[in-house]
Amino acid sequence: MDKKVTLAQLKEVVQEAYDQVKTNTGGKNADYIPYLANVNKDLFGISVCLLNGQTIHVGDTDYRFGIESVSKVHTAILALRQYGAKEILDKIGADATGLPFNSIIAILLENDHPSTPLVNAGAISACSMVQPIGDSAKKWDAIVENVTDLCGSAPQLIDELYKSESDTNFNNRSIAWLLKNYNRIYDDPDMALDLYTRQCSLGVTALQLSVAAGTIANGGVNPVTKKEVFDASLAPKITAMIAAVGFYEHTGDWMYTSGIPAKTGVGGGVMGVLPGQFGIAAFAPPLDGAGNSVKAQLAIQYVMNKLGLNVFSDNHLIVVD
């Protein structure tokens, strides 16, 4: 069923979401990464990217924050582009683990594959697969170019965050070498880990992430730049991964309450994809106990519920002038 709203009405809903949520004091910044602990906890922004390229944004949508685990979506897309859907399914997988995003136990339980590119083990494996094999500099160029194409503008490496991540990524070092033990990493483990750490340290804005989400929702064509970033056949694959594990062990609760596949990161960003309709992103540093932005979750839920939209329903948003 079509749900028609004017652009002005949609802007009003996004503004309402911001106003409703901005005073929420729940959660706290990630404190195990020094850089993230010191980010202003009051920063908050929401951005929506329609498939015609129009964007609606309220609050701190131009502030560059650490992309963190939202980057897993971007690199999963790059791996899908370079290898195809079947090879990624065979070598990495697409299953939720039901365990925390940085779980080592998940590797031990399913050592035939890392489960999904959207948890740490699968993301490190995906970084190892990025072509060309054996060339860290060219791999990095490919990762950054892919993020740029998805977002419609370039990210910026946050050097201080990269240092913080590198100094504290002991668990991920264990993951990389355990993957090597099970032949589930496809380049030098230390190189793959460094690429993963750097990609998590990219600085992006909520506006950029909404455009990236819009690119997925638009079947691989960036709504703003009009560039075809990836083949339309891959859009349902990456969206399925996001729907299955975007909020890790709390993904079921998220899908039940919001109705939109979304990926979260401990930098405070959440990126949601409503196929054929729009991309949405929100950012606020304070996190809940599972590492998900409290305000970003509430803001996206508000927009979805206010508009009566759900990926599992037949409601379809039509924005008219």
Curated annotation (Swiss-Prot):
Key word Hydrolase present: yes
Highest rank taxon of the organism: Bacteria
Biological process terms in GO annotation: glutamate biosynthetic process; glutamine catabolic process
Catalytic activity, as annotated: L-glutamine + H2O = L-glutamate + NH4(+)
Coiled coil regions in record: none
Pfam families per UniProt: Glutaminase (PF04960)
Keyword Calcium set for record: no
EC number: 3.5.1.2
Family, similarity comment: Belongs to the glutaminase family.
Stated name of the protein: Glutaminase
Organism, scientific name: Bacteroides thetaiotaomicron (strain ATCC 29148 / DSM 2079 / JCM 5827 / CCUG 10774 / NCTC 10582 / VPI-5482 / E50)
